[in-house]
Design a protein with these regions (language model features):
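Alpha-helical transmembrane segments and their cytosolic interface
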Residues: 1-13, 146-178
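Hydrophobic transmembrane alpha-helices
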Residues: 1-54
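Membrane-helix interface segments
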Residues: 5, 50-55, 106-112, 139-140
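Alpha-helical transmembrane segments of integral membrane proteins
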Residues: 6-15, 37, 55-56, 87, ...
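Generic alpha-helical transmembrane segments of integral inner-membrane proteins
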Residues: 13, 17, 21, 43, ...
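Short helix-perturbing small/polar motifs within transmembrane alpha-helices
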Residues: 14, 21, 78-122
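Interfacial aromatic-anchored transmembrane helix boundaries in multi-pass membrane proteins
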Residues: 23-33, 61-95
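Interfacial helix-loop-helix junctions of multi-pass membrane proteins
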Residues: 68-74, 131-145
Length: 178
């Protein structure tokens, strides 16, 4: 197994911190707030690749579990993961890994990045909505109306902005990432 470079460690930590900061920019609209955290998840996956992207989000989740107030509204602790938003938080790891895998596999083309981010969006939305249904004991229709539909416009905007940034930043970062 290859050792990580100092740059790879730093950029991975940076994306964990970026997710923590952007998650605090939230619009509370019910049990699942609108945050900019997913913007960072998309960027981490597409820019760092599957492994480092997923690791950056795993660091974010682990920081929250051990008590660092990184989750939305400065919450922390394992209890947050067992609450209604826990599936979305855990889904960040899956989404970043999936986005990174798809971009690496199919290239840094505009349409590939969009499709990869849509796949990541579907992955974390699926895990989050399933967990919400379980933890809140609701049905599919109610969960979709509470957890998915209100977020679609904002998530589409985040994906568009992330794609633009990735297209600009990827050529620069790839010089330093192996």
């Amino acid at each position: 197994m290859r050792k990580l470079t100092v740059f790879e460690m730093c950029i991975t930590a940076f994306f964990a911190a970026l997710t923590a900061v952007l998650t605090q920019i939230a619009i509370p609209i019910g049990p699942v707030p609108i945050t900019l955290g997913t913007f960072s998840v998309f960027l981490a996956g597409a820019l760092l690749g599957a492994k480092l992207g997923a690791v950056s989000q795993a660091i974010y989740v682990l920081l929250g579990i051990i008590g660092v107030p990184v989750f939305s509204s400065f919450r922390a602790g394992v209890g947050v993961l067992f609450g209604p938003t826990g599936g979305y938080i855990a889904g960040y790891i899956l989404a970043a890994g999936l986005v990174g895998f798809l971009v690496k596999r199919y290239g840094n083309k505009f349409y590939v990045i969009i499709l990869a981010m849509l796949a990541g969006y579907c992955a974390y939305t699926f895990t989050g909505t399933c967990w919400y249904m379980y933890s809140m004991e609701t049905g599919v229709a109610e969960a979709l109306m509470v957890c998915v539909v209100p977020f679609i416009p904002g998530d589409v905007l985040k994906i568009i902005l992330a794609v633009v940034l990735v297209r600009r930043l990827n050529p620069v970062l790839q010089k330093y990432l192996k």
